[in-house]
Amino acid sequence: MVFPAGDLASAVTSLPRVRSTLQLDPLTRVLLIPLAFCIWWIPMQPCRASDLRYQLGKRVHRFEAAWEERDSPEARARVLTPLQAAVSAFFSGNQTAAGKAIDQACLALDEAGASPEQQLWHSLNISLATPLIPLGTPELELRVERGYKLPETPEPTGMMEMALLRGEQVCSEGATPWTQLSQTFAVPTADLAEGDYRLRVRLKQGERQFEFPRQMLSVTANPARRLSKLADDEAALPEETPKSFRRTLRDTMKELTGLLGASRPETDYPAHALLEQCESWSSQLARGEAIRLATGPGQYWISPQEDRRAARCRLLWPSKQLPVADQAATDPVKPRPLVIALHGAGGSENMFFDAYGAGKIVRLCEERGWLLLAPRLSPLTGTGLELPGLIAAVDALHPVDRRKVFVVGHSMGAMQGLNLTSRSPEMVKRLAILGGGQRVRQVDAFQQIPLFAGAGAEDFGRGGVQQVARQFRQAGLTLEERDYSQVEHLGIVQVALDDVFRFFEAEETP
């Protein structure tokens, strides 16, 4: 459950310019638009609210990673109630209660139950003053405090061991006794070279050890001055600079500038690498040279733009080579299948990469050598670009196998997946909707597109999925419908993704 990186003002000002809006029935629109204002307001709050958003994302990732390893019918039964509470708290805007419920679900994976000490450890937040520091900063300050209260709170004891890592190499470390529930610690950073590091914090109590979710810390020389210069250079770029290049540069600069301010982003950005990339792009564009927004295997943030319509996206270029049978012998760069993943309300382009099974879809695409694109959605403006524009943006960076473009959407993203596909059915081989849906206005558009419709038996979005499935059955269209027992709205994506990818790979209709 990751929170949006945009703001309400940008969503509203783009309304007259964007065609790719959700086509909702009147009742759904009445329900979603107030929800959109509630959710999009969250990032505009001060630092504490943005840190709560970040901490909630870390809790979800910790739970989903544990659930992926320990999933079973019995485990699903134990986590069902706290997950339902988490979803309810999230949509009511209570991030603290949502985080507590997620931790309860994580602890419930162990059938033996959790001790008061384990409950306390899970309740703790590790908060950085900033995730981006200037080169030569003497030390990094971090704060350990409870994210929420517990009925029973053991006394804080043990040692907090902190280390900054590049890969698994320890570059700086320190240890301090943990004696207070709210306590500030410091890690020496004066001797760190420029780069992007992972902060590892472990609590040791005798033979017991608890490791907190790792966070990123970036060290770079003069970040404020360099970002200010970048802003001036971007404003001076030639008018003929391609819109997608300029928009990607501007959006990335905005994310980096936020790291220096009071807000905490929802995800871990490799800020040093991104800043150097922006400087390289800016220099090339100033000389009138073309740039490549993605140059090889890895993950990228891009902002393709057509006219005044744009989409902030996260892209996976997998490192695995395609099987020989899938490669065209004459192509120097082999076209790859593409999955377009559409998140639910309150999410962003980072949600499928960080959540929904701790980024499970990334692993599934990596294993197959498939490209993955996750655009940011808004209940008010949709994706910004239609499917042809999104596919073309990826194809400009790495050839896309146009015969194998798949779309998967969750909740609001499921509705958007139906809308986008109905407007460009020739672009999509197969479509999957999870935990959401609405009446399809043009069912005939799906004559050649098999649909996977999945919902949890305890999912409040189940009715929408069933409505779409019913339309497909009545029209005699190709459909695979799955209902997952003891699964609710948050867990449906993680639970169903294996079936979704099996469905995508099937050559015969189900």
What are these regions (language model features)?
Residues C47-V79, L124-P131, L135-E141, T220-E255:
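Amphipathic, heptad-repeat alpha-helical segments
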Residues C106-G136:
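Short, compositionally biased P/S/T/A/G/V-rich stretches that sit at domain boundaries
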Residues G454, F460-P510:
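C-terminal catalytic histidine-bearing segment of alpha/beta-hydrolase fold enzymes
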Residues S50-Q118, V339, V408, H489:
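Long, contiguous interaction/targeting segments characteristic
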